[in-house]
Amino acid sequence: MDQSNRYARLDLQEADLIAGGRHVLCAYVMKPKAGYGYLETAAHFAAESSTGTNVEVSTTDDFTRGVDALVYEIDPEKEIMKIAYPVELFDRNIIDGRAMLCSFLTLTIGNNQGMGDVEYAKMHDFYVPPCYLRLFDGPSMNIADMWRVLGRDVRNGGMVVGTIIKPKLGLRPKPFADACHEFWLGGDFIKNDEPQGNQTFAPLKETIRLVADAMKRAQDETGEAKLFSANITADDHYEMVARGEYILETFGENADHVAFLVDGYVTGPAAITTARRQFPRQFLHYHRAGHGAVTSPQSMRGYTAFVLSKMARLQGASGIHTGTMGYGKMEGEAADKIMAYMLTDEAAEGPFYRQDWLGLKATTPIISGGMNALRLPGFFDNLGHSNVIQTSGGGAFGHLDGGTAGAKSLRQSHEAWMAGVDLVTYAREHRELARAFESFPADADKFYPGWRDRLHRAA
């Protein structure tokens, strides 16, 4: 059934919809299946996403028609479809009237993902009007709070030098804590890898107790504050809270040095909101393991990594992994930097929409996946700044001289970039950085041709 006479209004102007402030706008790349018209399929998509179905129903009244989602722009050649969703469609909490991301997803990326007349449809951007934006929690903490703990400038404190303890599974509590101590002697921040939790060979309570002690010892030995991101991911709300409370109690006076990591993609919006509301004084570390199933450019359905990041800021993530923008081992490209800008800027341009965040606190980009000291300068050149959390697993513990030296090499790489000094030149007077060239020779050859002669040349 062609529903374009009801669910399509191509005379609507995007600027007018934004000025009206009553619609969430979504931009998709959509292709109908063979034999279906573009506008007809787009209208069915909007109907299925809001007030309609595949037939007219007798219970529809004038009010119902007033909250229809409307297709307002199409470009069949480029497969672009834009839909305006009235804000009244989205579910709100009965306890406080706040917005819920699960409702946003249910409507905009819900049943429409399985429609028989749609070959594929993927959301590439969305716009949130002020009246709806104000109903989301947004972050309570971000990198500025980490800088404060570290004793840095809270406006431009620079890269937080971090790692992921490797191997990701198989370490028992003491070796795990020993690895933490080793890295902290040179670095700032350690995160649990996403599967690390309460395995039988590494009970959480024993591991956390030893890690808290390792942090105290490292702080005493270096005179510097240290940070730890502890995984509290769980299916059950009460389990998450129990883990969080135990961790804070165990770290004691260093509780403000602790972030909580939640696997936000696999556990969903409920887990992120649980952590955000139950622990508002902790940095909420959004890990996105599994997201590539829908966000990868190879996937033609779902939504992009840009959309995931934007949703994370709405929900209140203090930081979210944003990949390495083509400079590490994970899928990505240099243009992905717009993802970081959308997280950090007061107003930013997306692929289709400009979003004004109305003072909502920024979310911190977390950079990980195949990074080491040799890859950092190019990454920072592309991004234009270094106010990120950077976590290198192999880039730290793959250093020939161990985790402490690996951490120092990462810090020295950042120092060189901040000073505008060529990395090979800087390495001549910084042993750990020099050894990073020897630790990762394939990267050294790729990014710094002739480094061997230059590194050992007399200054």
UniProtKB/Swiss-Prot annotation:
SUPFAM superfamilies recorded: RuBisCo, C-terminal domain, RuBisCO, large subunit, small (N-terminal) domain
Positions that bind substrate: N111, K168, R288, H321, S368
Reactions it catalyzes: 2 (2R)-3-phosphoglycerate + 2 H(+) = D-ribulose 1,5-bisphosphate + CO2 + H2O; D-ribulose 1,5-bisphosphate + O2 = 2-phosphoglycolate + (2R)-3-phosphoglycerate + 2 H(+)
The organism of origin for this protein: Cereibacter sphaeroides (strain ATCC 17023 / DSM 158 / JCM 6121 / CCUG 31486 / LMG 2827 / NBRC 12203 / NCIMB 8253 / ATH 2.4.1.)
Location of N6-carboxylysine modifications: K191
Gene encoding the protein: cbbM
Active-site annotation: K166 (proton acceptor), H287 (proton acceptor)
Protein's name in the database: Ribulose bisphosphate carboxylase
Self-association state and partner proteins as the record states: Homodimer.
Cofactor note: Binds 1 Mg(2+) ion per subunit.
EC number: 4.1.1.39
